């Protein structure tokens, strides 16, 4: 199967938990809904799940906290207004030196990654990412192999990670309305700062033709 391999890098990443107000905590890995958002930013329109399958690996050098300014609001005279005490200060958890290897099965999107309509971000708008490489590759289906930090459908034996509930996508077509949540699934998230590749067996594993090792595989998500 032909696919695109897109490599993105950044200074920081902070993927917020998409279903709850999470304070400073971030999601272990970007949700597949987040990856659709990154692709949509490059394309310049909403990219829907039926248009492409997605595989990915996300790595970083570590996790840290920083302090940032916040714009506070207060309810006064029946309206939301700027807080009388001015700006606030809060902590923000983030990943450092993030790198994303994105595998997209819709090769017609290549020009969008080469000339993106908007700046892709690793979470918030200050987490600016840049694309360093876009290439056409071949994904060969295999039954087993060594996999790195990604989201695998739960349960998946043979890996160390966290179990997380994340949406596949959101519907956000009606202006002024809250977005609608698509299917919510449980995944096993392999921590992004681990350097161990786990040997697993499952369906929907593929060996990228540009992988550094013959046993390396990626999971390509089925919506």
Model regions and ranges:
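Short, structured patches in soluble enzyme cores that scaffold and shape functional sites
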Residues: 8-10, 58, 104-106
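Internal, well-folded beta-alpha domain core
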Residues: 61-223
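Glycine/small-residue-rich interface belts in oligomeric ring/scaffold proteins
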Residues: 18-81
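Short secondary-structure boundary micro-motifs
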Residues: 11, 40, 85-87
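Extracellular structured ligand-interaction cores
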Residues: 3, 51-53, 97-99
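N-terminal, Lys/Arg- and Ser/Thr-rich interaction peptides
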Residues: 1-20
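Primarily extracytoplasmic ectodomains and periplasmic/lumenal surface modules that are beta-strand-rich
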Residues: 13-15, 45-49, 109-111
């Amino acid at each position: 199967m032909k696919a695109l391999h897109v490599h993105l890098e950044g200074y920081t990443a902070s993927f917020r938990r998409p279903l709850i107000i999470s304070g400073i905590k971030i999601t272990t890995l970007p949700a597949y809904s987040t990856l659709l958002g990154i692709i949509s930013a490059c394309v310049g329109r909403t990219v829907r799940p039926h248009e492409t399958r997605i595989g990915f690996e996300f790595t970083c050098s570590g996790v840290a906290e920083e302090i940032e300014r916040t714009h506070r609001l207060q309810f006064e005279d029946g309206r939301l207004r700027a807080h009388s005490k001015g700006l606030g200060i809060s902590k923000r958890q983030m990943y450092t030196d993030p790198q994303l290897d994105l595998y997209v099965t819709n090769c017609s999107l290549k020009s969008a990654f080469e000339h993106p309509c908007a700046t892709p971000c690793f979470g918030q708008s200050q987490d600016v990412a840049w694309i360093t490489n876009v290439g056409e590759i071949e994904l060969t289906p295999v039954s087993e192999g060594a996999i790195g930090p990604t989201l695998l459908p739960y349960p998946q034996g043979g890996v160390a990670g966290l179990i997380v509930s994340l949406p596949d996508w959101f519907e956000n077509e009606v202006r002024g309305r809250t977005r609608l949540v698509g299917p919510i699934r449980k995944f096993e998230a392999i921590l992004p700062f681990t350097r161990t590749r786990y040997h697993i067996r499952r369906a929907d594993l593929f060996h990228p033709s540009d992988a550094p090792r013959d046993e390396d595989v990626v999971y390509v998500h089925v919506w």
